[in-house]
Amino acid sequence: MLTLRTLVLALLFLAQAQTYPPPYPRPGTTKVMENDLVIVWDVSWLKQAYPTHRHVYDYAGIYYTDGDRIIVSEQGARSPTHSVAWDTFVLPKGITHSEEGASEQPLRGIFLEFKQPKPVGTIDTRTSPAAFPGASAKQLKDSERVTIWELAPGQLPSPHLHTRDAVVVAFTGLKPRVTFVGRGTVHGDEQTTGADRVFTFEVK
């Protein structure tokens, strides 16, 4: 009986200790940029099954096309999921699942992984010039890791101050362009001339 109990405990330990790969890189996904704070990915859910993976970072993002996928839990439960263009999200690390693309035209999104385990918490406290984003931006999400803004192109204060590090994602004809703006930057615009939609992720 002791031997059986030991075997059961060993199997439980192995199950708990099981490791999974990170979600990216994988087919359909391109790394757009990386620095000490973030990794930015352009993600497409191709019509195929992807291996089980674990999100090792807190992450956030925005979908820029509609699309379908099937999310499969560690226990094997299958959840058909439809995502809509311009929906945003903020999610914690530790999520473990697999995914299958289910659309003829794949779901696409820009994902930011936050490399620091906790918010950095540092802001630029200067009061001049006017701080980003001014009065014309719409706040979409606010969490302990990030604030997501949708900007009206061309309507930011000029010049303006970025009190936090930020990732600017501009879309022109569903083609994303990603720019990192460091904390303390003072400039006149986000270099998004001609963009159809502009979103900024202020990293905390």
Where are these regions (language model features)?
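Sec-dependent signal peptide recognition
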Residues: 1-9
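Hydrophobic h-region of N-terminal signal peptides that target proteins for export
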Residues: 9-17
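Jelly-roll (double-stranded beta-helix
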Residues: 17-204
